[in-house]
Amino acid sequence: MSESCIDFRKAKFLISAPDIAHLNEHLPGDAGVEIAFAGRSNAGKSSALNLLTDQKSLARTSRTPGRTQLINIFELDENRRLVDLPGYGFAQVPLALKKKWQESLGEYLQERQCLGGMVVLMDIRHPLKDLDMQMIAWALESEIPVLALLTKADKLKQSERMKMVNEVRKHLGDFDDRVKVEPFSSLKGIGKAKVLGILNEWCHPQWLTDAIADAETEEE
């Protein structure tokens, strides 16, 4: 059975939650597939989500990095969701608040069984900071595939861009195919089609495809 293409333009806001406990209170259960977006507070997560869904304000962007403190959930369909995790690592955020965010991120990655993939966004000019590597390690420990998305790729010339992409791929080479690395620009649309292809693949794990097919058979 060939997998259908998810229409990411249909994404709609579902809920916000300050931590995993509140998330579990609002969701119908740890079911379906969630794809999480994580990154430093100035990595461009909100802009990336808006571009990928063709919606100008699905995820709120802020000129003040660190403003987004909640876990925000967007529904694609009854079985699939996108998750905008709190930005991490911004220097001007109070230490206590920064610690709380990191605890929420850790809890989410360790406890959500439906997490089917994680996009770690990094400024292509400053990739692989300590917290970026920690997020990647957390995901891989939970056997979650990772897309390292090098944002703001339009800031570099083509040759410089590919040089940085190759350097990051080499650095993450020990993880084999569990980590994909792609350049991306919300401003110029660089990498959009490639990213949507990866997300679509993550949205179709075999167990979910089989479950949907079984449900359709029972309804006939």
From Swiss-Prot:
Single Gene Ontology MF annotation: GTP binding
GO biological process, one term: division septum assembly
The organism's place on the tree of life at top rank: Bacteria
Entry binding sites for Mg(2+): 46, 68
GO cellular-component term (any): cytosol
PROSITE patterns xrefs: G_ENGB
Keyword Signal: no
Keywords: Cell cycle, Cell division, GTP-binding, Magnesium, Metal-binding, Nucleotide-binding, Septation
InterPro entries in alphabetical order: G_ENGB_dom, GTP-bd, GTP-bd_ribosome_bio_YsxC, P-loop_NTPase
Binding site for GTP: 39-46, 66-70, 84-87, 151-154, 184-186
CDD domains xrefs: YihA_EngB
Statement: the UniProt record of this protein carries the keyword Cell wall biogenesis/degradation: no
Similarity-based family: Belongs to the TRAFAC class TrmE-Era-EngA-EngB-Septin-like GTPase superfamily. EngB GTPase family.
NCBIfam families listed in its UniProt record: GTPase_YsxC
PANTHER family attached to this UniProt entry: ENGB-TYPE G DOMAIN-CONTAINING PROTEIN, MSS1/TRME-RELATED GTP-BINDING PROTEIN
Stated role: Necessary for normal cell division and for the maintenance of normal septation.
Protein name per its UniProtKB record: Probable GTP-binding protein EngB
Gene: engB
